[in-house]
């Protein structure tokens, strides 16, 4: 009965206060996504400050991502129980408090504890925005603008992360990587309390919650991320990695089989949402993969620091901001599938344009690929949001938003693991091939290394070969990174096949299965 009543409630008029409340939600999401990139650019600084071993330092990021990806699909359930207002207040309060805890951590374990809390709260803040678009705004221009703001900030945050992290690292102490969240956290918390709609909480739903299905999902997602973390180094079929993937499959299967699962997997019976999640997954691979791959090239090949890397990547962010107003207008009048096809095709081309780099590639050569990716990424996220979530009933929109955002984050995690596998397995192979070319085809080897034939050492001179090994390593990594760019482009281009298979957008919503949690 409560859900039927919820479905009849119309969004309140889009007042200034409502827009302020939605703005607070967007800032919270932006902080959560930005925090990932800000911290990852400065892990070495934190490692030195807290005397944490390099072998354990990666867990500072992994635990955040695990907690985040577990909480994302729970957001729909939590919105129904606590309402958007109180869930946001609780999440932003926890995120801000955990940020303070991270800043004042004194060892590895205290930092991990607060990163877990920070990640769980951050995971709630992300899908909360996309659910709010359809719960707070009626269909029309307001909903389109809200979608654009939320979608733009979601793709802008990873782009600005390296610049922000680099600036903080070079200007302040590592503590400010976390303390930067405090002021906006407090401001948005106050705005959320006073500006977001006041609805009744439904704490009684805790009594009927299927905790077993929650445990299955949590274990499955944690196992998947641990497996993805270890796969590039251990091998994708290594026993421990394969075991993690097996736990993931079994956990998801058991959760789906639960008659009243806490996660509404049955919503994927809606073709629009199912295909939208696939597109979101593909975008996650391309978007997070590109934001990871370009800094990798700049750091390993050009030896740039975080701030310089951030300044180079800023081109993408500027292109995103400049084209956003056009995306708002086009998204209102053009078929969502056609716009998505244009967006993914152009984004794939932008990825492919970066697949021909050399060790001499500089800012000018990296400019236009970034412009293309930045200009069209909005068309990869706004139209899919419109058809994936636009026809879901109000009582299920929050669950659908969780699944949609989970798909993008899973795509990002898998994409980064795939990149690491390509770069760090193919790099040594290319190095061996270049050394062989120095003996067999000096002219070709010199071209790859950016040298003249006269500058190449004699292939029988060990000391001479040692002198060019740094250049060989840079060239081999560049070739491996180029292959990763091509793989990202091919995967992104698969979205065109997905859109073709999808067919016309269908409006009927799936029926709630008998016994399922409404």
Model-derived regions, located:
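Hydrophobic transmembrane-helix bundles of small-molecule transporters
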Residues: 148, 170-280, 286, 304-305, ...
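12-transmembrane solute porter fold
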Residues: 17-41, 50, 54-61, 76, ...
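Short helix-capping/hinge motifs at transmembrane helix termini and TM-loop junctions
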Residues: 105-106, 138, 195-198, 232-233, ...
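Helix-loop-helix hairpins in multi-pass membrane proteins, especially solute transporters
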Residues: 41, 74-212, 239
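Small-residue-rich packing faces within the transmembrane alpha-helices of Major Facilitator Superfamily
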Residues: 69, 96-97, 182-189, 348-349, ...
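Hydrophobic transmembrane architecture of multi-pass small-molecule transporters
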Residues: 7, 11, 56, 187, ...
């Amino acid at each position: 009965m409560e859900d039927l009543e919820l479905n009849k409630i119309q969004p309140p008029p889009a007042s200034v206060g409502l827009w302020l409340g939605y703005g607070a939600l967007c800032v919270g999401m932006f902080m959560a996504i930005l925090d990932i990139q800000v911290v990852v650019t400065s892990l070495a600084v934190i490692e030195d400050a807290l005397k944490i071993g390099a072998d354990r330092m990666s867990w500072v990021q992994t635990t955040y991502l695990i907690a985040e990806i577990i909480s994302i699909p729970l957001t729909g359930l939590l919105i129904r129980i606590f309402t958007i207002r109180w869930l946001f207040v609780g999440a932003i309060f926890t995120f801000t408090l955990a940020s303070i805890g991270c800043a004042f951590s004194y060892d590895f374990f205290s930092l991990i504890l607060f990163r877990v809390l920070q990640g769980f709260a951050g995971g709630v803040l992300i899908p909360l925005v996309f659910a709010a678009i359809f719960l707070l705004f009626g269909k029309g221009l307001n909903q389109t603008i809200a979608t654009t703001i939320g979608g733009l900030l979601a793709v802008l945050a990873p782009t600005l992360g390296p610049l922000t992290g680099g600036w903080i690292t070079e200007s302040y102490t590592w503590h400010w990587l976390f303390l930067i969240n405090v002021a906006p956290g407090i401001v948005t918390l106050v705005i959320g309390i006073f500006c977001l709609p006041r609805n009744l909480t439904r704490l009684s739903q805790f009594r009927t919650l299927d905790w077993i299905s929650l445990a299955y999902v949590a274990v499955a997602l944690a196992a998947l991320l641990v497996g993805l973390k270890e796969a590039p180094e251990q091998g994708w079929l290594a026993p421990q990695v394969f075991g993690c993937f097996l736990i993931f499959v079994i956990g998801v299967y058991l959760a789906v089989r639960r008659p009243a699962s806490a996660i509404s997997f049955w919503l994927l019976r809606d073709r629009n949402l199912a295909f939208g999640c696939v597109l979101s997954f593909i975008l996650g691979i391309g978007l997070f993969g590109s934001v990871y791959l370009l800094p990798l090239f700049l750091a390993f090949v050009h030896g740039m620091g975080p701030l310089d890397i951030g300044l180079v990547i800023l081109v993408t962010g500027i292109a995103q901001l400049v084209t956003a107003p056009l995306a708002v207008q086009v998204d209102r009048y053009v078929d969502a599938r056609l716009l998505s096809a244009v967006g993914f095709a152009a984004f794939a081309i932008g990825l492919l344009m970066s697949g021909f780099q050399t060790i001499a590639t500089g800012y000018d050569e990296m400019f236009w690929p970034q412009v293309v990716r930045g200009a069209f990424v909005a068309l990869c996220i706004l139209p899919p949001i419109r058809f994936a979530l636009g026809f879901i009933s109000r009582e299920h929109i929050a669950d659908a938003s969780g699944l949609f955002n989970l798909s993008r984050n899973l795509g990002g995690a898998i994409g980064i693991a795939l990149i690491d596998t390509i770069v760090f397995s193919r790099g040594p192979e290319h190095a061996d091939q270049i050394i062989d070319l120095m003996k067999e085809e000096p002219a070709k080897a010199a071209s790859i290394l950016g040298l003249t034939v006269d500058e190449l050492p004699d292939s029988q001179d060990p000391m001479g070969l040692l002198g060019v090994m740094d250049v060989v390593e840079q060239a081999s990594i560049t070739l491996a990174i180029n292959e990763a760019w091509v793989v990202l482009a091919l995967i992104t281009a698969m979205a065109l096949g997905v859109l073709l298979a999808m067919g016309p957008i269908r409006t009927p919503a799936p029926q709630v299965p008998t016994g399922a949690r409404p």
